[in-house]
Amino acid sequence: MHKAQKFALGLLAAAAVATASDVVQLKKDTFDDFIKTNDLVLAEFFAPWCGHCKALAPEYEEAATTLKEKNIKLAKVDCTEETDLCQQHGVEGYPTLKVFRGLDNVSPYKGQRKAAAITSYMIKQSLPAVSEVTKDNLEEFKKADKAVLVAYVDASDKASSEVFTQVAEKLRDNYPFGSSSDAALAEAEGVKAPAIVLYKDFDEGKAVFSEKFEVEAIEKFAKTGATPLIGEIGPETYSDYMSAGIPLAYIFAETAEERKELSDKLKPIAEAQRGVINFGTIDAKAFGAHAGNLNLKTDKFPAFAIQEVAKNQKFPFDQEKEITFEAIKAFVDDFVAGKIEPSIKSEPIPEKQEGPVTVVVAKNYNEIVLDDTKDVLIEFYAPWCGHCKALAPKYEELGALYAKSEFKDRVVIAKVDATANDVPDEIQGFPTIKLYPAGAKGQPVTYSGSRTVEDLIKFIAENGKYKAAISEDAEETSSATETTTETATKSEEAAKETATEHDEL
């Protein structure tokens, strides 16, 4: 009996360990006190049925455990149980992550949803914009992240310090920033003040900035130096490449050995184009479908393509040709010189527009969307997207209301399958809805409200040139699920049906 009791107690202990969590679950009556008593908190607002939330859960747990020793708390709120609390904090989709420094200092989490990224982001949040660096803590500071920046500035050089602080405030989510006025330490690090050293745990190990301290120049130096010469393109790095502001060259290959071989072969090209084009390898077995997004065949590798991120233009290298140093160098040089036309993927132009919603394809995009005489509301959708399917009848109703209104010749309700057509807009998820006002086509307005006919009409009336307010008969309701956006990497619908990994970024 004694042994049985010990065995039972052992099972209970094991269960306690297995179920222990470093993520604190908060409710309405505990939320405010928890935020007030902890200097820095990352809170996740989630729903148990949400596929993206389920995918985040183990990553969030791992990050919470890692950050516990640094006294950075991770919390979560179940919005199906705490509806009022979630509405109070403006939650419109799941998961929503917010950084709290007290109840009055709240900012959205802008990092990736991976344990390492969450950990890195929150550590940077815990640091001051610029940390003091000395000979005693320099080596430790270098290890704070994959890339850190240290300014070596004389104590009397207030101007350089102010410029560096401006950059740090702007980019603090991306890199840890440190500063030292120790001339001997600067000399030991091989620089003379004023200078900035970017320390990194890849490529050549560090990069030095010794030009005049100007915000734009330092920003460019940081972004260029912190990007691997030839990095790895995947879910954790993709958004960073997309936000870098320069073209991205993809090297597709099916094996790690082949990716390394091609990287070594093309490295001199990447070095010559540093700061002009980012280069990265991509696993063709895991993410081969992304080749199709670049207008490459998805069954013929290795392959190479360049994406002009700002204009969302694709420049695929001929897959019938061998990837050699000479061939890729010539291709890249021609791209930089503007000698290559972008490849455009488009469905056929509809022979006739049927229905109240105008169908847009790549070949008629400019003609319809950029018609300067009309306010054009356009939905960028994906056929597999569950939220797009849910929106469809409401969007048709919206189109019908405008088609029979006094604004029928001045307002267009349109849609485009963004998976089958190249569009110049940067689309982060589906559905994305934008209004291109007449007379201001260069300043489209992205819709972020609930997906009801009433609210969409209000959006058009408030942001369009013609202030096209119309009435609608049916009263619509909205919920957080209606405003959720599905990322292009994974549809929530598919996440519910299968646990297999998707091969899109």
UniProtKB/Swiss-Prot annotation:
Keyword Repeat assigned: yes
Bias type Low complexity, positions: 477-488
Site entry (Lowers pKa of C-terminal Cys of second active site), positions: R451
Biased composition (Basic and acidic residues): 489-505
Keywords in alphabetical order: Disulfide bond, Endoplasmic reticulum, Isomerase, Redox-active center, Repeat, Signal
SUPFAM superfamilies: Thioredoxin-like
Protein name: Protein disulfide-isomerase
Organism: Humicola insolens (Soft-rot fungus)
Lineage: Eukaryota, Fungi, Dikarya, Ascomycota, Pezizomycotina
